[in-house]
Regions:
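Catalytic cores of nucleotide-sugar-dependent glycosyltransferases that transfer UDP/GDP/TDP-activated
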Residues: 1-481
Length: 481
């Protein structure tokens, strides 16, 4: 039995702020339990719900030197869906109403503590992993500590580490002097070939330098981050380590996202009866959001953080023109104020055509995936993207820009070969996006049978975690040897 431990800053169902939690909570369930024992370790935030805290039992505790203090470290344990979770507890480190704050120094301190405490806890929980699988900058110090601080102990000798980059933009940077003091690492770690990058200490860089293998969340993104445009200052290092770098596309939980059993949607449906049943969800959503009741009008959905990365500057530029077309547009999400206000304005101006929902609701997101005809994702960059996978699962045709995971998961429609699962454009250009939306409109209105075939192919595609899990298993086997 090979043993793997995921170390991360969040994981469903205990705590979630984004797609990272879905990966950490879903992937371990799908890895073959006959050959692998996969467990998860995350912080015990005080903002975890009481219902979830009640599932935890105390395992043990110890004290650890950190940042010139002797800190308490509690270890809690819980079982969920057949997976063992461990929680690192320290009230002062993990207090607050949210898992993350906007104070970068606070975040760097908190996750430096978590990295050291998580490794220090292993001998006490009677679990010696063959591989520690780290996720994003919050666990970037784990491979560093493992190689340089813990390898002297017999227990840790030979443990391998994997660093998964979910979004290279976030790196955990702070000034060298402070990070040196917090981590207790000596001077020779803070050089350009180790943790120092552009005069700052960089926690993600530490993980990339010291991990035995590096993964990211799609094949295309793995190639993109080796270029200056997408590399966020790390492209040189990633090119140097390209033999150890691989892309593995994320999956989605096919039990949670299943139009046949989804409790949030008005009318359940499947790949066989969607032609009759999906339209009922459209009517229900139009009624709920106060849009004009019209079965035939193309309904375009957007569920996203409203930021530049997600392509909202393109949408902002073209929104007036889109509203002149025979379409309805539903938006769900929060983000930059300029985009929130832009959508509010168009909701006011075209009240029966545009519905701006500037908040987040799990229930409404499911209703949008089920009700819409098309789903728009014109991202500037997208490491993997999960929304397009949910759209495909629900028979909602994605319109995307060809970048990262969007390029890997949405096959562009080809009317001559009658193939493809969505529509895509390659250049980051508002007019090219608009031309692609209009092309999709044309197929939707003039060639309904073709449109339904696109839906058929999208719903038949398999982006469940089981496909990704096999690739992770191959990597663990390769590492363990």
């Amino acid at each position: 039995m090979k043993k793997v431990l995921f170390m991360a800053s969040e994981g469903v169902p205990f705590i979630k702020t984004g797609g990272l939690a879905d990966v950490v909570g879903s992937l371990p369930k799908c890895i073959d339990k006959e050959y692998f024992d996969v467990r998860v370790m995350i912080p015990k935030y005080s903002c975890i719900t009481e219902e979830m805290k009640e599932k935890m039992t105390s395992k043990t505790y110890f004290h650890m030197d950190f940042n010139w203090k002797n800190e308490y470290v509690g270890i809690m344990e819980a079982k969920e869906d057949g997976v063992t979770y461990y929680f690192i507890d320290n009230e002062s480190m993990f207090s607050g109403f949210r898992p993350y704050s906007d104070n970068v120094l606070e975040e760097v301190t908190k996750f430096s503590f978590f990295s050291k405490a998580a490794l220090s806890a292993l001998p006490l929980i009677d679990f010696r992993p063959d591989v520690i699988h780290c996720h994003d900058w919050q666990t970037g110090l784990v491979p560093v500590y493992l190689r340089e601080r813990f390898q002297g102990s017999e227990f840790f000798r030979g443990i391998k580490s994997v660093m998964t980059i979910h979004n290279l933009k976030f790196q955990g940077k702070w000034d060298v002097k402070t990070v040196k003091s917090i981590t207790g690492l000596p001077d020779y770690f803070f050089t350009p070939d180790k943790l120092e990058a552009y005069k700052d200490a960089n926690l993600l860089k530490g993980g990339i330098v010291y991990a035995d293998a590096i993964t990211t969340v799609s094949d295309t993104y793995a190639e993109e981050i080796k270029t200056p445009f997408y590399g966020e200052g790390m492209d040189g290092l990633l090119r140097a380590r390209e033999k150890d770098l691989r892309g593995i596309v994320n999956g989605i939980d096919y039990d949670d996202f299943n139009p046949e059993t989804d409790k949030y949607i008005e009318h359940n449906y499947n790949a066989v009866n969607f032609r009759k049943e999906k339209i009922k969800n459209k009517r229900a959503l139009q009624a709920e959001l106060g849009l004009e009741q019209d079965d035939k009008k193309m309904l375009i959905g957007i569920v996203s953080r409203l930021t530049d990365q997600k392509g909202f500057d393109l949408i902002s530029y073209m929104m007036e023109e889109m509203c002149q077309d025979t379409v309805q547009i539903v938006i769900l999400g929060t983000g930059e104020e300029q985009y929130e206000n832009m959508f509010r304005h168009f909701d006011w101006k075209y009240n029966n055509k545009v519905s701006a929902n500037i908040f987040y609701s799990e229930a409404l997101s499911h209703k949008i995936y089920a009700a819409c005809d098309a789903f728009l994702m014109p991202s500037l960059f997208e490491p993997c993207g999960l929304s397009q996978l949910m759209a495909l699962r629900y028979g909602t045709v994605p319109i995307v820009r060809e970048t990262g995971g969007l390029k890997d998961t949405v096959e562009p429609y080809n009317e001559y070969e009658s193939e493809g699962t969505g529509f895509s454009f390659s250049n980051y250009n508002a007019h090219e996006m608009m031309a692609t939306i209009r092309y999709a409109e044309r197929i939707y209105y003039d060639r309904k049978r073709e449109w339904n075939k696109i839906i058929d192919r999208g719903m038949a595609a398999d982006f469940s975690w089981h496909v990704s899990a096999k690739k992770y298993q191959e990597m663990y086997d390769w590492l363990i040897g």
